[in-house]
Swiss-Prot record:
Record bears the keyword Oxidoreductase: no
Function comment: NDH-1 shuttles electrons from NADH, via FMN and iron-sulfur (Fe-S) centers, to quinones in the respiratory chain. The immediate electron acceptor for the enzyme in this species is believed to be ubiquinone. Couples the redox reaction to proton translocation (for every two electrons transferred, four hydrogen ions are translocated across the cytoplasmic membrane), and thus conserves the redox energy in a proton gradient.
Organism: Shigella sonnei (strain Ss046)
Name under which the protein is recorded: NADH-quinone oxidoreductase subunit K
Enzyme nomenclature, EC number: 7.1.1.-
Pfam families documented for this protein: Oxidored_q2 (PF00420)
Swiss-Prot/TrEMBL keywords: Cell inner membrane, Cell membrane, Membrane, NAD, Quinone, Translocase, Transmembrane, Transmembrane helix, Transport, Ubiquinone
Assembly notes: NDH-1 is composed of 13 different subunits. Subunits NuoA, H, J, K, L, M, N constitute the membrane sector of the complex.
InterPro entries: NADH_UbQ_OxRdtase_chain4L/K, NUOK/Mnh_C1-like
Amino acid sequence: MIPLQHGLILAAILFILGLTGLVIRRNLLFMLIGLEIMINASALAFVVAGSYWGQTDGQVMYILAISLAAAEASIGLALLLQLHRRRQNLNIDSVSEMRG
């Protein structure tokens, strides 16, 4: 069995990597990938904690996180396609530019 600390450290590292990708990158696709990594890291923390205490609540939260990630991915990819269709690039800064 993997110790609780190792699983939580791995989840924290993954969360920080996802947060870094979300903050640093300006491409919408890479921002969505960073957000997915963050959601999966939090789901991993739930599973590790639930396994440590012998409860199934962590697995239930994992299923909830996966369904949330699927909904987020479908909406995010729809926005990504519309942005690419209208602006011909995926730079998130081009969305904030207003036409005058």
